[in-house]
Swiss-Prot record:
GO terms for molecular function: ATP binding; ATP hydrolysis activity; metal ion binding. Zn(2+) binds at C267, C270. It comes from the Eukaryota. Belongs to the arsA ATPase family. It is found in: Cytoplasm; Endoplasmic reticulum. It comes from Paramecium tetraurelia. NCBIfam families: GET3_arsA_TRC40. ATP binds at K22, G23, G24, V25, G26, K27, T28, T29, E231, N258. InterPro entries: Anion-transp_ATPase-like_dom, ATPase_ArsA/GET3, ATPase_ArsA/GET3_euk, P-loop_NTPase. This is ATPase ASNA1 homolog 2.
Length: 325
């Protein structure tokens, strides 16, 4: 298969693109360059960093925060940096605010929500997806955190479903408890009404997650691009990523291999490293023979700013083969 990302650019139905891999392999550079290519093709594009150690600001050489901001010098491109692991106290959970006037009730319901591991992050992720979808971008690109964090992020819809089932069970237990202490919670009718309001909000959030989950499993709308370098640990993480995404039924058929050294007669160390890399490159080409495997040479300078990204963009579209050592 052609060793470029042209197949991604030529797919008109794509809506969501996730870019991920091991830390320090060039995910942000790759995702930012891809976002630049889409924006230049005329698509209204946003790139969102979900990595707590954000690098988009450095990559675009522009201050980027928690709200979408237009990238200077590139039409149709916006960016934002978010933390999917929001502090529950700052998260707009569909629970307490506006429903309960009694502090004891608020406290108990807060405990009920927090008793489900990962439910706050799942709801935060759902809120993010819902808000991004409402922004009406043609394409959303996620510059994700290192592999383990990303896999957990992509598994949030399953967490949400399990969490909601547990909350429903706790709900009836909590209602039985409330009936024994009506003086604390007010009348049973008032409490039931408040609980129904809360769970109506949660069900709405579940619907959002379900919709997002369906889109993520639609290969015509969503794809994942793996990024790695030609070293053992990175190759191992890439295979783990491919296996997990396959289990989640999320499409992945592109892998970008960064920092590839080409032989240089004037540099013995470069040649030694290139020889070591070739072993892993050959293995990856063989393992992913049904993937678009893009080989990206090690850059002389740090890829930063619009000019640096434009050069990197060109390389993503130029086919290169494994260097002969």
């Amino acid at each position: 298969m052609e060793p470029t990302l042209k197949n991604i650019l030529e797919n008109p139905s794509l809506k969501w693109i996730f870019v991920g891999g091991k830390g320090g392999v060039g995910k942000t550079t790759t995702s930012s360059s891809l976002a630049t290519l889409f924006a230049k093709s005329g698509k209204k594009t946003i790139i969102i960093s979900t990595d707590p150690a954000h690098n988009l600001s450095d990559c675009f050489d522009q201050k980027i925060g928690g709200q979408p901001i237009l990238i200077k010098g590139i039409d149709n491109l916006s960016a934002m940096e978010i933390d999917p692991t929001v502090d529950p106290d700052k998260l707009k959970l569909p629970t307490l605010q506006g429903f309960m006037n009694d502090q004891a009730t608020k406290s108990l319901l807060s405990e009920l929500i927090s008793s489900v591991p990962g439910i706050d992050e799942a709801m935060s992720f759902a809120e993010l997806m819902n808000s991004v979808d409402e922004m009406k971008y043609d394409l959303i690109i996620f510059d994700t955190a290192p592999t383990g964090h990303t896999l957990r992020l992509l598994n949030f819809p399953n967490i949400m479903e399990k969490g909601l089932n547990k909350l429903v069970q706790l709900r009836y237990n909590f209602q039985n408890l409330a009936s024994q202490f009506q003086g604390l919670f007010g009348s049973q009718e008032e409490f039931d009404q408040q609980m129904n309001q809360m769970f109506s909000k949660i069900e709405t959030m579940k619907d959002t997650v379900t919709k997002v989950n369906a889109q993520m499993k639609d290969k015509n709308k969503t794809t994942f691009i793996g990024v790695c370098i030609p070293e053992f640990l990175s190759m191992y993480e890439t295979e783990r990523l491919v296996q997990e995404l396959t289990k989640f039924k999320i499409d992945i058929h592109n892998i970008v291999i960064n920092q590839v050294l080409f032989p240089d007669d004037q540099c013995k160390m470069c040649n030694a490293r290139a020889k070591m890399q070739k072993k892993y490159l050959d293995q990856m080409i063989d393992l992913y023979d049904d993937f678009h495997v893009v080989i990206m040479p090690l850059q002389e300078n740090e890829v930063r700013g619009i000019d640096g990204l434009k050069q990197f963009c060109e390389l993503l579209l130029k086919p290169k083969t494994v260097p002969q050592v």
